[in-house]
From Swiss-Prot:
One of its GO terms (biological process) is pantothenate biosynthetic process. InterPro entries: Asp_de-COase-like_dom_sf, Asp_decarbox. It holds the Pfam family Asp_decarbox. This is Aspartate 1-decarboxylase. The keyword Cytoplasm applies.
Length: 142
């Protein structure tokens, strides 16, 4: 049996730009793509924390070290500069691999710089400034 599992997540990134007249995709700082194990052209789900919009597109690498998160094409109608987003990638794997697989979870600061790297999709790092705002599904509200 094949299972579709969380592969990568960049949590609470800030959208830095949006270009409506573009062929599509999301531009992600190449450093963030590396931290999250994302490849150019990989399918990515974007969840907008501000308005609840969800959409599927593909990743393209942006300039390293810039913190760029750019929404391109028609998605710019749904997701705007300043919005907080979660970028998610899924992978399909055999059952045995799914039981052992550890996803890449990247928490970022307000400038989209990685501040916590982990593998637990449900954990909330205690040492980041937004931790008090986040609900940990395993322990409840903080």
């Amino acid at each position: 049996m094949l299972r579709t599992m969380l592969k990568s997540k960049i949590h609470r990134a800030t959208v830095t730009q949006a270009y409506l007249h573009y062929v599509g995709s999301v531009t992600i700082d190449a450093d963030l793509m590396g931290a999250a194990d994302l490849l150019e052209g990989e399918q990515v789900t974007i969840v907008d924390i501000n308005n609840g919009a969800r959409l599927v597109t593909y990743a393209i690498a942006g300039e390293r070290g810039t913190g760029v998160i750019g929404i391109n094409g028609a998605a710019a109608h749904l997701v705007h500069p300043g919005d907080l987003v979660i970028l998610i990638s899924y992978g399909t794997m055999e059952d045995a691999e799914a039981h052992a697989y550890q996803p890449r979870i990247v928490f970022v600061d307000a400038d989209n710089k990685p501040i916590d790297l982990g593998h637990d999709p449900g954990s909330v790092p205690l040492d980041i400034s937004v931790a008090a705002e986040l609900f940990d599904p395993r322990i409840g509200a903080r």
